[in-house]
């Protein structure tokens, strides 16, 4: 008969226990995740009998940004932005504008992509 020493059998038992505990924790985590997904789906599709849980879920449901923006009137903000910007064309600029802060002639700054960056 083959005898296994007590230290090796104890190590074998510890590894088996650790293996079982890890697999059980993974199984319960997966079970919890699937249960919560199915639970939400059942209560969101159930329109026959509203329950307290369904009302609670409905009150905390997230609303998309598009729906919020459809309900809100942004015209005051748009008109203020348009009145603040003073767009000039190239023909209107005569080059004689004096900067009130420094008392010198204002220079035009070219806009567009930075030529130093590729």
Swiss-Prot record:
GO cellular component, alphabetical, reads: apoplast
Ranges for region Disordered: 75-118
Q: Has keyword Secreted?
A: yes
Q: Which InterPro entries match?
A: CLE9-13
Presence of keyword Secreted: yes
Q: Where is the signal peptide?
A: 1-35
The record lists glycosylation at 113
**Keyword terms of this UniProt record:** Developmental protein, Differentiation, Glycoprotein, Hydroxylation, Secreted, Signal
Write out the biased-composition intervals (Basic and acidic residues): 75-91, 98-108
Superkingdom of origin: Eukaryota
One annotated GO biological process: cell-cell signaling involved in cell fate commitment
Q: Name one GO molecular function term.
A: receptor serine/threonine kinase binding
Q: Which residues carry this modification: Hydroxyproline?
A: 110, 113
Family statement: Belongs to the CLV3/ESR signal peptide family.
- Which PANTHER family would you find in this protein's record? CLAVATA3/ESR (CLE)-RELATED PROTEIN 10 (PTHR34359), CLAVATA3_ESR (CLE)-RELATED PROTEIN 12 (PTHR34359:SF28)
- Protein name per its UniProtKB record: CLAVATA3/ESR (CLE)-related protein 12
Organism of origin is Arabidopsis thaliana
Question: Lineage of the native species?
Answer: Eukaryota, Viridiplantae, Streptophyta, Embryophyta, Tracheophyta
């Amino acid at each position: 008969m083959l005898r296994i020493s007590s230290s090796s059998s104890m190590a074998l038992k510890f590894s088996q226990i650790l293996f079982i505990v890890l697999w059980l924790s993974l199984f319960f985590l997966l079970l919890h995740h699937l249960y919560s997904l199915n639970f939400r789906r059942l209560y969101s599709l159930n329109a026959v009998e509203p329950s307290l849980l369904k009302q609670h879920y409905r009150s905390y449901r997230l609303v998309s940004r598009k729906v919020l923006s459809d309900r809100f009137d942004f015209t005051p903000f748009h008109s203020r932005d348009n009145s603040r910007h003073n767009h000039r064309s190239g023909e209107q600029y005569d080059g004689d504008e004096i900067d009130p802060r420094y008392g010198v002639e204002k220079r035009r700054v070219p806009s567009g992509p930075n030529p130093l960056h590729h």
